[in-house]
Amino acid sequence: MNYSFLFAPVAAQAVSFSVSLAESRIPDHPADPLLRPASGSLKAGYSTRYEFRGLIPAGCNQTAPVSLDWRSDLNEHYSFILALKEELFPGRPAIDLDDETVVDLGFQRKLGKAAYAAFSLRANDGGLAGLASERLFGNSSTTYEASLVLRRDLDFLPGFYVQGSSAYSFYGITGWWFDMCTGSDSRLTENLYMGFKFGAVLSSSYWPSGGNGWQALYFRVTASYRLFGDVFVEPFAGLHWLGRGGHGLNRTYGETLVKGNRWVTGVSLVYSF
């Protein structure tokens, strides 16, 4: 796993950009009143398809993702957040994707009892963003972005939340991403948790002309079963629909780069701490 790509523009940008995880690394249960110096999860799994912001690249791109999510509470309002993810492609992807490495670093801010904001800096190497940076814009396979995530738990529907995120990519590819979703996390039994999420993803000035706008709709259901202690197994299933912007991206690329109406399934082994 090579993180050397971090030490180029990041050193110059880190002063002015601090940021959050576009996929909401905001905790599933943010109401815990205790301050914790270290909490998070270590995860390894398998997915039938690789996903990038709701988009499914053409071909059967199976992946073996490995990730670490870390949070350190600084005080009752602020927490430091870190996320590392390596998306490994066991076989040769249909569109020649490189393994994807993602690093997120930032801060989370508690806004009252049931609302949170997170602001972070993300470095991404490889994957669909890296391919697009090289093939569509003639740059390196590394991109950098700043991101803001806002989440609000709904008092009138216990376990439900709404969430929105915006991300600006400022290196490799420049442009905006917006992700709006709603979902629920609930405990069914002592050892079984269930969650679902439904959302829409849009882009602005990220892809070449004609490829922006509504990118995808997605729906995902996840079960989390405690095997023992703090070790869980998490199967999931999701459905992705391709939007008008995604179809425009295929026309710009000149061939089918992303597909819609695709199921994604997988399973992960998770250690929570």
What is each model feature region?
Residues 1-22:
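Sec-dependent N-terminal signal peptides of Gram-negative exported proteins
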Residues 17-92, 270-272:
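Short glycine/proline- and aromatic-enriched beta-strand/turn motifs that initiate or cap beta-hairpins
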Residues 167-205:
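A contiguous pocket-lining binding segment that forms or flanks enzyme active sites
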Residues 226, 232, 259-273:
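Outer-membrane beta-barrel "beta-signal"
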Residues 204-256:
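Glycine/small-residue-rich hydrophobic helix-like segments
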Residues 44-48, 66-72, 84, 105-109, ...:
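Residues on the lipid-exposed face of transmembrane beta-strands in outer-membrane beta-barrel proteins
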Residues 57, 80, 84-181, 238, ...:
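Outer-membrane pore/translocation modules
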Residues 26-39, 73-81, 93-95, 110-118, ...:
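Short loop/turn motifs that connect adjacent beta-strands in outer-membrane beta-barrel proteins
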